[in-house]
Every structure is written in structure tokens, then in C-alpha cells.
């Protein structure tokens, strides 16, 4: 019971912290609601890049694949391998979800280093990679949580919740807390790594000539890709775990 109360209090404190603003932000007013426009603008750009490149490649498939078709087929095979390794033989229906997570996070991370967001002037604040905002990473983590709950319940029904008292009912609070910490760890890991990478590059560019930070920028591109892979792999692992019922 103490563990449950502690977790509830933790989430209340996190909710209070979410109301604190650091820096300036650009909002759209929609009725009584304020929408965080910076994240929406950059997210739409990333989605447009993904949709546009996909349409260009698949609208006229060739018998002898060209470079773009070969690249997309390689990416699809890679995502299928990751899904099959983590989920098992029932991986098929989850390939689109895992692939969407991986590609959105990958392109979002790279957009922070390759697209000149800062030159676009806003009335307040500035644009940055979508994954540089905690709202985006939390939303992706919550989607993952919904996915693995759905996977477990759709396969086992209400018997899925029996995992919380395995191997002994004494572990019930800890097993419940584990499901709350999964989205927290997913979201903060991705947000922290992307934010830290962009801050390091900004500080180096302001202190030394542009040539010096270039190796750090290339390292940032590599780590950004790794973070996308880690997020997608963990999401697939959580889905596979909920379907198999083991930890």
C-alpha cells in the first residue's frame, strides 16, 4: 500500500511540474484550450517527410528495384527482424506500429541536427526537433503502454492481470509500479538524450569555431539513430512480454 501511495504522489508531483514553463513557448488558442504549436509544426514537417518519401518510392514500384525502393525494403526487413526477435512468431500485426515508432523518432531526432529550425522566426520561442520536447516523448511512451496492455488483454482476456500476483501476491504493488515506470523510463530516456545532444552542440558552436563541433554533430546523428532503435526495441519487447506473460 505504501508503494502505491508513493507512486500516486510521484505522479501528482510530475503533473504539478508539467505546469511549470521554462523559457517562452508559442501557442495556438483553440476555444478554451492552448495548443503547443511548436511541437505540432515540427511534428507535421516530420510526418510530411515520411509520407512524401514513401509516396515517391511506392507509387511506381520497379521489377528491378532502384535505390529508393531498395532502401525502403531494407528498412522494412530491419523493422520486421526487430519485431520478430522481440515479439516472437505473432509479430506480424505489430510491424506497422513498431515501424511507425522507429521511423518517426529516427527522422525527428535527425531533423534536430539537419534542419535549420532556428532560422524560422516565431512570435515566441523557437522550433526544435519534436523529440526535444517532453510532450512528444511522453505521448509516444503512453502509446506504447496502451499497445502492450492491448496486446496482453486481447490474447489472454482478463487472465492477463493475473501476472500482477506472479510468482506471489506479495509482489502485487511492485508489479503494478513496474508498469508505471516503463513509460516514464521510455519518455525521459529519449527526451534527455536528445536534449543533451542539442545543448552540447549549441554550447560548442557558441564557444569555438564551427569546424570543431562537427565531429560532435556526427556523433549526435549516430546516437540519435541508436535512441530510435532502443525505443522501438523496448516497445516490441514490452509487447512480446505482455503476450507471453513472462518477465
Curated annotation (Swiss-Prot):
PROSITE patterns: ATPASE_A. It is found in: Plastid, Chloroplast thylakoid membrane. The chain crosses the membrane at residues 38-58, 95-115, 134-154, 199-219, 220-240. It is a multi-pass membrane protein. Keywords: ATP synthesis, CF(0), Chloroplast, Hydrogen ion transport, Ion transport, Membrane, Plastid, Thylakoid, Transmembrane, Transmembrane helix, Transport. GO terms for molecular function: proton-transporting ATP synthase activity, rotational mechanism. Coiled coil: none annotated. The keyword Transit peptide does not apply. One of its GO terms (cellular component) is plasma membrane. Gene3D superfamilies: ATP synthase, F0 complex, subunit A (1.20.120.220). InterPro entries: ATP_syn_F0_a_bact/chloroplast, ATP_synth_F0_asu, ATP_synth_F0_asu_AS, F0_ATP_A_sf. Key component of the proton channel; it plays a direct role in the translocation of protons across the membrane. F-type ATPases have 2 components, CF(1) - the catalytic core - and CF(0) - the membrane proton channel. CF(1) has five subunits: alpha(3), beta(3), gamma(1), delta(1), epsilon(1). CF(0) has four main subunits: a, b, b' and c. Belongs to the ATPase A chain family. This is ATP synthase subunit a, chloroplastic. It comes from Lotus japonicus. The gene is atpI.
Amino acid at each position: 500500500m505504501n508503494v502505491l501511495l508513493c507512486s500516486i504522489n510521484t505522479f501528482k508531483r510530475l503533473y504539478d511540474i508539467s505546469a511549470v514553463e521554462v523559457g517562452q513557448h508559442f501557442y495556438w488558442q483553440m476555444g478554451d484550450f492552448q495548443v503547443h504549436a511548436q511541437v505540432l509544426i515540427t511534428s507535421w514537417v516530420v510526418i510530411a517527410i515520411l509520407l512524401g518519401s514513401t509516396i515517391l518510392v511506392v507509387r511506381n514500384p520497379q521489377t528491378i528495384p532502384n535505390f529508393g525502393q531498395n532502401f525502403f525494403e531494407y528498412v522494412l526487413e530491419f523493422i520486421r527482424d526487430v519485431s520478430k526477435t522481440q515479439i516472437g512468431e505473432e509479430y506480424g500485426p505489430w510491424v506497422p506500429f513498431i515501424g511507425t515508432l522507429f521511423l518517426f523518432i529516427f527522422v525527428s531526432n535527425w531533423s534536430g541536427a539537419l534542419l535549420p529550425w532556428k532560422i524560422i522566426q516565431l512570435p515566441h520561442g523557437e522550433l526544435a526537433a519534436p523529440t526535444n520536447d517532453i510532450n512528444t516523448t511522453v505521448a509516444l511512451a503512453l502509446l506504447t503502454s496502451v499497445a502492450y496492455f492491448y496486446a496482453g488483454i486481447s490474447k489472454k482476456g482478463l487472465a492477463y492481470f493475473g501476472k500482477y500476483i506472479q510468482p506471489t501476491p506479495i509482489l502485487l504493488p511492485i508489479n503494478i509500479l513496474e508498469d508505471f515506470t516503463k513509460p516514464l523510463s521510455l519518455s525521459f530516456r529519449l527526451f534527455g538524450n536528445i536534449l543533451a545532444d542539442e545543448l552540447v552542440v549549441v554550447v560548442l558552436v557558441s564557444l569555438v569555431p564551427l569546424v570543431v563541433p562537427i565531429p560532435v554533430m556526427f556523433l549526435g546523428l549516430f546516437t540519435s539513430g541508436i535512441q530510435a532503435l532502443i525505443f522501438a526495441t523496448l516497445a516490441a519487447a514490452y509487447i512480446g512480454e505482455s503476450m507471453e506473460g513472462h518477465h
